Design a protein with these regions (language model features):
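Alpha/beta-hydrolase superfamily serine-hydrolase fold, recognizing
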Residues: 20-254
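Bacterial Sec-dependent N-terminal signal peptides
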Residues: 1-24
Length: 254
């Protein structure tokens, strides 16, 4: 318990660092010197959407606690893992974490729950290959911004959950993507940067009601016509007293 709390505090401190400049004076970007493993396929297929990158600190330690990073794209993109690392991953590496930045299938590739299935497959892959990449999976945090924050929150609130039902609609949250379905997909801490928590409240925004909205693309229809599915995409619907430690960051204009 104490180790998990300490890791979350370290994660929060690293988040504060994200607000600091990441370049040297004059716009010169400091060269990367830390160990990196690029384009690892966590699903055992050929999809770009199923690749991840691992970044380790340059301290030479034997193992590092892990933070998974998910980019934001309104669920439209399937290949922005590099942007996820540059946006919020680099300060975490500087703070001593191993950062795993992942791709996932877009709403154009497949409808929900494919995206959370991919996230969980990536977590299982990391556990299965912890020794190969110097990872200490006794702590796995997850963070992301916008739609990546949404998927991070969803990963956290669905620890120990295989399927979930709302009304007459059931979704397979865990999924069976990849070769490591015997491994756990649980996470120990979540930091959500302005990702939707209750998708139903987004109905107040006129653009969300549109059948062409990002939310509609994610679930395969207008949100107003699919209330059960909208609820199933909402992290709020899964909250119990047993969820891991959470930090959700929103602004007044989100």
């Amino acid at each position: 318990m104490k180790k998990a709390i300490l890791s979350l505090l370290m994660l929060c401190c690293a988040i504060v660092m994200m607000a600091q400049p990441q370049s040297a004076p004059g716009g010169f970007k400091m060269p990367e010197t830390n160990p990196q493993y690029k384009d690892l396929n966590y699903a055992g297929d050929s999809l770009e959407a199923h690749r991840l990158d691992i970044y380790l600190p340059a301290t030479g330690h034997e193992k590092y606690k892990v933070v998974m990073v998910i980019y934001g794209s309104a669920w439209f993109a399937n290949n922005m893992k590099a942007m996820g690392y540059l946006s919020i991953g680099k300060p975490l590496v500087d703070a001593g974490f191993a950062v795993v930045s992942i791709n996932h299938r877009s709403s154009g590739d497949a409808k929900f729950p494919a995206q959370i299935n991919d996230v969980k497959a990536a977590i299982r892959y990391i556990r299965a290959h912890a020794e190969d990449y110097h990872l200490d999976t006794s702590f796995i945090g997850i963070t992301g911004y916008s739609s990546g924050g949404h998927l991070s929150s969803l990963a956290g609130v669905t620890n120990h959950m295989k399927t979930h039902t709302v009304g007459k609609t059931t979704v397979d949250i865990e999924g069976n993507v990849g070769h490591y379905t015997d491994y756990s997909s649980e996470v120990d801490a979540v930091v959500d940067w302005f990702g939707p928590i209750d998708m139903a409240t987004m109905e107040r925004c006129e653009t969300v009601k549109d059948a062409k909205s990002p939310e509609a693309a994610l679930i395969g229809g207008a949100p107003a016509d699919m209330p059960d599915m909208i609820s199933l995409t909402s992290p709020y619907s899964y909250v119990t007293p047993n969820i891991p430690r959470f930090l959700v960051i929103h602004g007044n204009s989100d």
